Design a protein with these regions (language model features):
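Membrane-proximal interfacial segments on either side of biological membranes
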Residues: 1-52, 63-203, 207-248
Length: 248
């Protein structure tokens, strides 16, 4: 690679292998090792720091992605995390590792849900869009801002409402929705909301189809709504109700 610097500005070209990045203030995983990394970056510091990522392509055992974007630091009397315009494409991703690579700007609710809900599976055809003043994330009511992550999840096991995310501690309170398995679904984060739309899946031995699970606002008091079609033994239907919050 190469780096050029002059008068408070510069550019960098990277084409490397087996690279470790320190990203403690960027993503949840503080050290990310990449088998392949290519990037074209420009920056300037006047009147405030601006970083333009013209292109980045990275891959390791967990993930393969491409992205581009602009970051502007807050300036003058303003303070805060700054402004970001980021567009990304996820080529492949090991689902349980997803939380490690999502920007911290996505917020603790989103990151915690990803860490505990995606038990297994793989992500394909993913896209990510973040645009706006990061101090106002996830941009509820912000017409000129955007946060949206969409992806296809296949062969997945999903804990749609993990107790640890809800702050539930007692054994009784930890009774949550049964694990959904063998899922092929579309996953969407849109601002503060999360929606899972599954064409197929299973709970116990019951087969599920046309399932939609939605959390309107991620956070410690999130409410989950689920509807869909289930086919299977009556005993499994009763068990599902009795071991989920439906029985409360």
């Amino acid at each position: 690679g190469s780096i050029d610097m002059a008068d408070g500005a510069g550019s960098m070209q990277l084409a490397s292998r087996n690279t470790t990045l320190i990203l403690a203030v960027v993503v949840a995983e503080p050290r990310v090792t990449l088998a392949k990394l290519g990037a074209s970056v420009r920056w300037k510091s006047d009147p405030a720091l601006e970083v333009r990522v013209e292109s980045v392509a990275a891959a390791n055992a967990d993930i393969e992605l491409e992205a581009s974007g602009i970051y502007r630091a807050a300036q003058g009397e303003r303070s805060g995390p700054g402004w970001l315009d980021l567009t990304g494409r996820i080529v492949r991703l090991h689902a349980p590792a997803a939380y490690r690579y999502v920007p911290l700007a996505a917020g603790s609710g989103t990151l915690n849900w990803l860490q505990h809900a995606l038990v297994s599976g793989r992500v394909t055809d993913g896209t990510m869009r973040v645009k706006g003043d990061l101090s106002r994330f996830p941009f509820e009511g912000e017409r000129d801002a955007e946060f949206r992550v969409a992806a296809r999840v296949v062969d997945a096991a999903l804990d749609v409402h993990p107790a640890v995310v809800q702050g539930e501690r007692s054994a009784e309170a930890a009774r949550a929705w049964p694990l959904l398995k063998d899922i092929d679904a579309d996953l969407l984060f849109d601002r503060a909301s999360m929606t899972v739309t599954a064409k197929r899946g299973a709970a116990y031995s019951a087969k599920l189809s046309n399932v939609v699970a939605r959390i309107p606002e991620l956070g410690p008091n999130a409410k989950l709504g689920v509807h869909g079609v289930a086919e299977g033994p009556l005993a499994d239907m009763v068990r599902y109700v009795n071991t989920s919050p439906v029985s409360r």
